[in-house]
């Protein structure tokens, strides 16, 4: 199943179509043939593109400076938090905590811990948004950063973000935006205008870079001016004579986080995407992403209840809890059965605040026909014999391997005697609860 010809509804992954124009441009000899050890004088074209990309990402974010070095969203989180730590260290403030909503991506607490902070969970309220009372209770002089994803992983925009930013800034803390869901707000609102101090982008999501093989990705970070001195060195700069170079003279920088200039291939594709869309095109991206998600949600929510919100942003989270209770069919089973209908499964069992969660993100590049056909498959599965669904997939050579064992003891080579396996062995179902993700 290729992203070029199939629908990937993976929530929080933004599996949009990857324009082939960008691939052709990235393959041009003047791009693909570059080497980072070349003299700067021979890299002027690419350095100009990277410099311009820094400016475009800063403008989209409504912030002042951008580093392109981080190689993935999670590394962007870590880099931004290291910059925040350096900022507070220079101020002589001992801040030890990073506040994180319970609906956050798992990389958020991991990044906080790696940066030397204690991750403190802030619970959600009954509407799936940040519980302001719990937030206030944990916001003290030891709090350094609040990491928010907005829209959040439930697919809801939190209108409290301005108030959250004000409360943070009153205590001298910073507001961080996990930019994983920027596809929902491109051209609609700038994070900086919401009070965000620092954030990361996922160009391989928002700006259409290919996800193939789990990477490569990129995780540029954007910051306000008072955090700019701490960005990784070197930065791409424009010299007084109009040429471009690398600025290594950054005494307060946290240092390198990635060799050379970052993952330039992904960054170049993001540049091509932004230039081809333009401001109006980027706004249309988010318009259609939100429209598609709401249309799909309306088609299926009577069979798969959506616990939070009447409308969503770019994605929504449905629950298979009632199917699990009444028919023994869990989110995992539904995801497996979709394979028989030639669809990739959605993200399941995330976010953790929804029982039997199924997260759907159709993106802006899917047609109405595709959404309706996918909804028909979901509705058919909801009405099927439970035993059929629980034994799926039925059309694949291997049905349900032990996914936990595969992760813990991966077999990374093939031998001829493994070529033929008895069907009975191939179709051993995984025990209930043994694996959480497809």
Predicted regions and their residues:
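Non-catalytic terminal extensions of PLP-dependent enzymes
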Residues: 1-65, 82, 189, 239-261, ...
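Cysteine-centered functional microenvironments
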Residues: 36-38, 68-70, 149
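General small-molecule cofactor/ligand-binding pocket signal
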Residues: 67, 120-122, 346
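Conserved PLP-enzyme active-site core in the AAT-like
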Residues: 45, 75-245, 328-329, 356
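Short strand-loop junctions, especially beta-strand C-caps/beta-turns
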Residues: 71, 125, 149-151, 319-323, ...
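A short, small-residue-rich loop immediately preceding and capping a beta-strand
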Residues: 64-70, 97-100
